[in-house]
């Protein structure tokens, strides 16, 4: 994943604190042992997970770069939802610097327009693109704000995506 050793260690500590049964020691390494019901594990751990989005830029132009879809746009690519009029992209902090989003957007007044051309979510970690050039489904779900997740249509499609990715309650581990 390209995460620092300390970050990975901290993540394992937090997972072990939430549910000690899913983290096992193999010598000096710690590994995940999710068990048969991945959906149950997700439901147990998801409230403790934070959004992967560090910051968000609402831009008046679409960046000229290859960055994966993120947030609602990524979820729409995996489901029957219709996307917002503007796409949402997921970028790394390095891409944010390369695209000069942090400084240029504020200085030029390009950030935060009422009707943006796109939204760029800067993620706390390197996004792993899923097929179709979108972030992975679980990151897409976690990056949605609470008001979008509470929408009944979005909540229903989140359930459908989770069932496909993690398997239904009755299907166990895939």
Task: List the predicted regions and their residue ranges.
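Short amphipathic alpha-helical interaction segments
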Residues: 3-17
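A short, conserved structural fragment
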Residues: 16-27
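Minor-groove-contacting beta-hairpin "wing" of winged helix-turn-helix DNA-binding domains
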Residues: 28-35
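Short, charged/polar, Gly/Pro-enriched secondary-structure boundary elements
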Residues: 38-44, 76
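Alpha-helix boundary/capping detector
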Residues: 41-42, 57, 167-168
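Short gly/ser-rich loop at a beta-strand->alpha-helix junction or flexible surface loop bordering the NTP-binding
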Residues: 47-125
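Hydrophobic alpha-helical interaction segments
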Residues: 95-174
């Amino acid at each position: 994943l390209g995460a620092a050793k300390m970050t990975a260690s901290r993540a394992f500590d937090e997972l072990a604190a939430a549910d000690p049964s899913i983290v096992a020691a193999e010598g000096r390494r710690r590994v995940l042992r999710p068990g048969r019901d991945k959906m149950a594990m997700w439901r147990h751990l998801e409230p403790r997970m934070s959004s992967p989005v560090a910051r968000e830029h609402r831009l008046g132009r679409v960046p000229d770069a290859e960055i994966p879809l993120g947030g609602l746009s990524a979820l729409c690519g995996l489901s029957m939802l219709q996307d917002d009029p503007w796409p949402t992209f997921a970028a790394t902090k390095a891409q944010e610097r390369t695209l000069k989003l942090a400084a240029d957007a504020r200085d030029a007044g390009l950030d935060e327009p009422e009707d943006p051309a796109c939204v760029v979510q800067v993620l706390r970690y390197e996004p792993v693109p899923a097929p179709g050039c979108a972030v992975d489904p679980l990151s897409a779900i976690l990056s949605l704000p609470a008001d979008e997740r509470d929408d009944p249509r979005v909540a229903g499609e989140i359930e459908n995506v989770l069932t496909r990715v993690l398997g239904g309650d009755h299907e166990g581990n895939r």
